[in-house]
Structure formats: structure tokens, C-alpha cells
Amino acid sequence: MQQNSEFLTETPGSDPHISQLHANSVMESQLLDDFLLNGSPMYQDDSMAHINIDEGANFQNFIKTDEGDSPNLLSFEGIGNNTHVNQNVSTPLEEEMESNRALKEEEEDEHENKVFNEKNIGNPAHDEIVFGRKETIQSVYINPLDYLKVNAAQLPLDVEVSGLPQVSRVENQLKLKVKITSETPLNQSMLYLPSDSISREKFYLKKNIEDFSEDFKKNLLYINAFVLCAVSNRTTNVCTKCVKREQRRAARRKSGIADNLLWCNNINRRLVVFNNKQVFPIMKTFDNVKEFELTTRLVCYCRHHKANNGFVILFTITDWQNRLLGKFTTTPIMITDRKPANMDTTKFNNTTTSSRRQLTEEESTTEYYSTDNNQLSKDENMPFQYTYQHNPYDNDSQMNNIPLKDKNVPFPYSISQQTDLLQNNNLSLNLSLPNQHIPSPTSMSEEGSESFNYHHRDNDNPVRTISLTNIEQQSQLNQRKRARNNLENDIGKPLFKHSFSNSISATNTMNPALHSMQDFSMKNNNNNLPSINRVIPSQGPINGGIEVTLLGCNFKDGLSVKFGSNLALSTQCWSETTIVTYLPPAAYAGQVFVSITDTNNENNNDDLPQEIEINDNKKAIFTYVDDTDRQLIELALQIVGLKMNGKLEDARNIAKRIVGNDSPDSGTNGNSCSKSTGPSPNQHSMNLNTSVLYSDEVLIQKVIKSLNINSNISICDSLGRTLLHLACLKNYSSLVYTLIKKGARVNDIDSFGLTPLHFACISGDPKIIKMLLNCKVNYSLRSHNGLTAREVFIANHIHSKEIDKKQDNRDNHKFVHNDTYISEVLSLFEEFQNGTKFTDSVETDSNYSISRKYSQSSFNSSLLDNESLNENLFESQSMINPTSMEIQHPTLQLFENSSYSEYDQSDFEEDGDEDLFVTDEVEKPGVACREEQSELLDIGSSANEPEEDNGSTSLWNRVLHRINDDLPKYEDLFPLSWGKDDKLKTTNQDSIVEQSASNIENSENSEEEDYEEEEEFLKKQFNRFFQNKQNFRNDKMLIFFWIPLTLLLLTWFIMYKFGNQDSSINHISELISEYLRIALAKFLLGNERMKTAFRSKLSNLQTTRMLNDLIVS
């Protein structure tokens, strides 16, 4: 201070203006210091000496004349001499001010800790409360579901939380008011917040709560807050994306250091955070009532947790011994990223809607017709004026009865009538008036009859176009203009529907046709029911998963959407006119009705949910399309492409590559099965070259069996569906069996939480359901819409109203829907839920699991153990052309389908002993045409057996016929030789090209036909690719040429490497290598070039030697 006072003294020779300027800067800094110190609440109780000390310290920070770094960016050197102004300042004023503020914040925190300890703690030395923590939080996870089971009425404390809005954002801070009421006096005076919900490091206690004394902990009420999904009560955790956003949000400070790292690094961090200190005193304390406020934020969006109904916050109050004293669950809150303007508009609309409901029918009638009826009694020749004064939004109901000269009334007249009406009625009618479509003067003609049609949009019924006259003439015009008026009528729909019936009764003498509308208008008593007007898109796949938008009116949160009998996978209400939902899977293709279920309807007196009935004239219809086979083939192609190239590619590119590689050899196949009229004695010798077409199930099954054990068969599509999901939906039991045996995961879930068991219950195949249950599948898993597999089965197969429709539309899956079938399928779940096995099964092996190794016949017998279930099994759909073979019993076909083709790829099987059973050799149902075998087996069997295109038979038959095998033919040893085969291949290839060219020429007029033919061609080539695959047993070239050559070369190398160096083998090897080098050099360089190269090398060697001799000497 002395130095500063000397500086303020005007010295001789100094400029008085500069001295005065610096004195003014000192006074400004002093005033700023006084404001900061006196404005802070922590210094109000201190002495003036403490303030003077802080003033001196801050003054020294601001004024440093001896060091030449004044905060005023001016330093004075050589007082009394020539004054020099130095503008090269190292530290700006803003950084100096920021450091002072940080210093003061630390001092405030220390002072607050000191004052808090002196006021609230009896022993400051032991229970000193210090805030600000740097150590990692080690918290214990608490399951909030344990508290939901406790009845709040039986707890000693009554907790109430208020101030939570319906919609908020992650950036908005919520100020919650908590009130705790008790019958007995409460001794606690402070609150303790959980460590998992503290947002900033400076709010944490520096020590753990366990380090404090017992008396201090008894004086605390422990509050816990958990965020759950509304309705489903599913627990939530902050997603990684939102955690990173919170880190960026905290790092926006000038220092650039995030102060929420403790919360971010905490494993048990919660979705709700508090901007309060971890321990703070209660503001309002009474004997039996405690009140305080919490500053809260919810830091994750509802859509990240698929909480369509929002979040609820569960508050619990415990004591220091972790005994539950009270709990409270808040109302749902939606955390969205909508702007505040949108939320305010929504709130305003809700207020307007509630004000409309308070208006009774008598009041609306009185306000509307208090003046208009008097005018009507004076002059009844003014129907146009009466129509507009009755209701400006229902003016179309009587426009068609106006004479032509009245229709041509100038339009400003009608606007003035509406303006007078709105001025007389101080209602909310003007809110929807700007949204009403205002016709132009040119549209008020016979062609522009759009405004004359009354589009009555009721909440119970879809759009109805009501015209009192000339309906047939205007129907086409209404359909053409309906698209433009739909959205406008949604917003500007009639606000008073009860007054419409009153207007009809008042105008019965004017138009007798209005009598027929009375009954219709009286049915529209409830204006709060939602209705669906349009579904976008109107069709989708049966496996679901696509986004579907519903357009309508009176939508709200909490509604459930059903497609037929299936609940939507997810539902999000965006506004009163828009709902976005995700399509659920269905068991069959066809049209279903889209309905809305309101479980929270106040007018519903029953306990069951109320479904909104849609009028028959315009129902919301959605069409399911079956394209699951295409998706199955695409996934199979991706698996093959991953095996071939090691990367995921588009399925079409993989198919084209396979077809391109296989097309030269594809012409070797003979005629297709469609051209064969029947078996002949010579077909056995031609079956190797017979073109065989397979169904999708058998084709994919062959692909899976051709893969090795390490192949990834659980590749999923964009929705998380694997081959097992789609095979269960299509009732491909043989493919399901192959996938499970190859190691497919039975508990995989897709993006909506659906497992393969869910899809099996949708299709309803009892054999697949039993197969999955035997594989220890988790049958209690719930999808994201809260349904288990058993509930999905009940929803799809027990609704009696839809059984007949399902039986008519299900062409590929024919089940017998009866009580016995349903009870037996439900008994499967009950038995596995009770932990019991099938007692009536012939399977006695304890290791009853398909994913483990066990005999094929054992598994087949276990599938067919229940006789009643076999009667309800579907007919096999594995053959493309079933007319060429005799239809067998469904049970036999299932037996064949489950054991088919276990031996054609036996080299890839895990357990080769399974193929040694003669009883396992059964007919193969995937072949579209059959050939009879003319030779008899040595065991005396005279049955005809079909063979595959590659000529492979069972392992048992191969062993029997091995002794009768002849020597290999020349064509077998050299299958790629030039000759007649090459000409035959070229001819067949040209025929295929000509046939494909002719097909393209015939289908040039239709793009759809071209696309279908291209897919059919790719499918045939894909079949031939897997058909022409040659087994190791028939590869004669490998056995008789390559293997002996490899053995010869290997023997030569061993004798050369480890034999005697003077042997003839070494001498011959050296000669061969020398001649090969010489021949290669002559070929590359030529004789003259080689001589020149050697001469240059020799000359270089001589020169180098001479130089070396000179260097040495």
C-alpha cells in the first residue's frame, strides 16, 4: 500500500494528466473490488479488517507498477524523467479478471464450508464438511425394481414431488419441490444426495459418507432417484452418446476443463442429475413437514431407450441404516429434442382443447343462435346468411340447396358474415379459421364445387363426403380434390359438433333432405376418440420392422396401435395428427385392419382396453407382403460371400459373380425336369447331368451344409434378423434344424427384442416351438413392446374372430385351429416353465439338446412323439413341382425333410458315425423330378431310390458298392479335355444365350417382367452352381495325377536335402538347375547380350582389384 500511495503522489517532473488518469483507474478497480466483496454473501458477517486485507490483495493484483504489468495496458517508467508508454503487455485484462474470479470462488467455497460446519456440526474437527472431490467414485448398484414392490401407503413418510412438466429437453433444468410429511416429528435436518446423480465435482463431498461420525449420519435423510420407462417400468442407463454430449457441454467453460468427469466415469451413473451439493440443509423445517427444492436435469432422450410413453422418476427416502421410509413416483415426462416454441404451442393447444370441453351444448347453442334465429324469423329467404352464421366451418352442409343466383353471391359478403360471427362470440373459433381453406371467387362455380361438399371428419369415423344433391356427378371431383383438403380439414375441423344437430332441426322446413342426417350427427357424441385416416406406406413385409406413419386426428400419448391382432413394435405420438410406429411381424400375407387401443380412456368403464371402431366405409387397411424367401436368399448369399471374399457384400453382386463363374459349365446340364415325362430305364446313367431345381428351403439348406464349422451363419440384416429368425417365421423346420445343428444362436434378438421363438410363435408351428424349447431357449424374454413368446402365440392364434380369415388366407401354412392344438402348444410352455421334460417322448437320452451331438434317428423320433400334434402339422412346401410325384402324408414328409441330405456333404459333418444307420436313408423331398434306379441292392432291396445330381448316395450304399467299382474312364481322368464335350458345352451355352435373349426380347414392354426373369435366371444359375459341386470321392484327377506328382517331388526333395552329396540325385539336380539358369538367361538377354554383360562384369572386377592394390600400398 505504501508503494501504491507513493505512486499516487504527484512527483515533480511528472505529467499531471497521466497521474490523474492512473488515479482514476485505481479508483475504478477499487470500486469493482468493493462491489465483488460487498456483493458476496460470505463476507457480510466478516469484519472490516478482513475486507481491507482482501482489498489490499486485490489492489495489488490490479496495480503492479513496480513490475510494469498494469492491467490498464499502460505502464509508466522513469517517473520524474521522460515518461514512456509501453504497450507490450504479456497478460490481458480478461485473463487477470478470470484468475481473480477463480480465486474468489475457491475462497467462497472454503468460507462456505467453514460456515456450514460451524452451523450444522457439533464437532467441526471430526465432521468437517468440505466439498470438492477428485477421487474416483466407488458406488454400489441399487436395483430400483426392489422398491416398486413396496406399498407406499405402508411407509411412515408421505412424499410428494411437484414441478415436473410433461415435456422437456436435456438442456433444461427442472426445479422440483419435494414435500415430506410424517405423523411423528422428524429429527433430521439435512439431506444427502446419491453419488450417482451429482453433476459437478465441486458438489461432491470430499470424503466418503462412511468416514463421518454416526451422529452426523443420523441427522441425514438419504434421497435416491431412479429413472424408469413409463408403463413398462424398465430400468434406464445413460447411453454413451449422451455421456459424450455431457462432456462437451461441461467443457464449454473458458478453462476448457470438464468438471463432470466423476459422473461420466461412474459405472452406475444415473439418468437424473442434481445441481445441488451432496449435503445441504432443509429450507423449511417443521415438526412433521420438511420442504426443499432440487435442481434437476434428465440427460438422455426417451427415444434412446424406446420409451414411447416417457420417463417416470422414482424417489425414495431412507435413513442412515438404509431402511425405506417413503417413496414417490412422478408423472411421465417426455425428453425430446423439440424446440421450446413447439412445446409452448403444444401446451397452448392442450389448453384450448380443455377449454372447448368445458363448453356445454346449451351454452354453445345459446351463443350461436341468440341473434341468428331472430334474423331468420324476419326473413326466411336468406339461407346463405343463416348457413354461415350457424357455423362458419359447417357451411358446406347447405350450399347445394342454394339457387344458382345465390351461389354467385360475391365472396366478400360471406367473409363479412364470418367476421361478425367471430366478433359476437368470444370463443376460440378464430384459432382454426386461418387454417380453413378459403376458395377463390373463380372456384365458386359448378366446376369448383369443392367448397360445396361437406367433409365431416368425426373422431369416430373416417372422412365422409356428404353432398345433399348431385352426389354421383361430383364424386370424381371430390376424389380429385380430397388430397388437398385432408390436411386442412384435420386442422380446421368443426369445434362444435353438437350444434350441428341443432342447426338441422332448425332448418327442417327449408330442406327435407336434412332429416336423414339427424341420426348420423347424433351418433357423434364423443369428440375425443382418435381416428386413422391414412397409413403410409400401405403395405410391408410379413417379418415387419419397417416404419409406418399413421395420419389422423385426436392422437395422444399412451395409445397402442395394432395391425390385425399384433401389437406394434414401437409407437411414438408426434402430434395430434401423426403417429409413427413400427410394423409387427405377421404369420401370413394379406390385408389387416389397423386399430388404436386407448388403455387410459376416462370414458371406458370396463377394465379392458377400448379399441376404436372404424366405420366400414373407410377403414384403415394395411397389406402384408411375403418376401421372406428373398431375404433368406440374400442372407445366405452374404454368408457365401463372406466365406469367399472375407467381407460383406451386396447379395446381388455375389449372385452375379457366382453366375458369371458358373455360366461356361452350366451348359453341360441336360434337359430340365419339366421336359421329362417319366422315368426310363436309362435314366440312372444320365442322372449325373440332370438339371434339378430346388426350393428355397432346400437350396439354403444346401448352402449351410456346404459351409465349414467356423463359418458365421448368424449374420444379421439391418434389423438384426438372422437366418434362424426368418426360417422360424416361414415354418422351414428342416432349415431350422440344420441351422441349430450348425451352431446358430437361439437367443439372438433383433432390433425390437424379438427372438426366433417369437417368430415361431407368430407362425405357430408346434414342431419348431418344441425344437427351440428343447434347445434351452429363454422363453421368458420380452420384446421391446413387452410381449413374451407365449403372449405372441395367444395374440395370433386364440382370437376367434380372425381364425376363419387366417385359414382362408394362409396358403402355405395350413394349421387346424382347434382347442386341442392350442392347449397342447400352451402346455409346452407350461412344462418348460415348470422345469419338466416331455414325458410322452420316446427320447430317453438325458442330453436332449439339438445343439449337442446325438443321433439323427433319436432327434427324428423326438419330433414325432406327440400324435395329436402331428395331425396339425402343415403340408410340406419344399418342392417346386409337386405334380410330378405322389403326395405323401405330411408326417412322412416332415420326417423326410428333417433328415434330408445328411450324407451328400458328409465330409463337413462333425460326427461321421451318424450316417451309418440304414434306417436314416429316406427319400429326399427337395427334388422336383425323380428317376427310378434300375439296379437292385445286394441286400435284396427292390425299392427305387432317387439320387442327387452329383451321384452321391448314402455312406452305407457307398460301402456296399465300392467292391463293384470299375476302373476310371478317360473322361473321368481328364474332364477338361478338348473334344465333343467342348462342342456340347459351346452349343448348350449358345442355346442358353439365345434362350435368354429371346426371353429379353419378349419382355421388353414390361420392366417388371424383365426384373422377374432376371431373378429367375440368377436363381437357376445359383442352383446349378451348387448342383455341379464335385465331391472328393469323384475327383479322379486329384487322386491319380496331383497326389502322385506331389509325392514324387517331395521324395526327390528329401533325398536331395538329406542324402549323400556325391549321389546321382544331387548331380542331376545341379545339372538341371544350371541348364535352367543358362536357358533363362539366354531367353531374357540373348547370347550376345549375355557375353557383353559378363565382359563388363569382369572388367569391373579387375579395375576394383587394381584400386584396392593402390590403396593398400
From Swiss-Prot:
Species classification: Eukaryota, Fungi, Dikarya, Ascomycota, Saccharomycotina
PROSITE patterns: ANK_REP_REGION, ANK_REPEAT
GO annotation (BP), single: cellular response to hypoxia
Keywords carried by this UniProt record: ANK repeat, Membrane, Phosphoprotein, Repeat, Transmembrane, Transmembrane helix
Name of the protein: Protein MGA2
Swiss-Prot/TrEMBL ANK repeat ranges: 719-748, 752-781
Its membrane topology: Single-pass membrane protein
Location of the IPT/TIG domain: 530-610
Subcellular location: Membrane
Residue stretches in coiled coil: none
Modified residues (Phosphoserine): S255, S467
Cited InterPro entries: Ankyrin_rpt, Ankyrin_rpt-contain_sf, Dendritic_Spine_Reg/Scaffold, Ig-like_fold, Ig_E-set, IPT_dom
Additional notes on this entry: Present with 300 molecules/cell in log phase SD medium.
Biased amino acid composition, Polar residues: 344-357, 437-452, 663-687
GO molecular function: lipid sensor activity
Presence of the UniProt keyword Glycoprotein in the record: no
Cellular component, GO annotation: endoplasmic reticulum; endoplasmic reticulum membrane; nucleus
Region annotation Disordered: where it falls in the sequence: 91-114, 344-376, 437-462, 658-687
One Pfam family matching this protein: Ank_2
Organism: Saccharomyces cerevisiae (strain ATCC 204508 / S288c)
Membrane-spanning intervals of the chain: 1037-1054
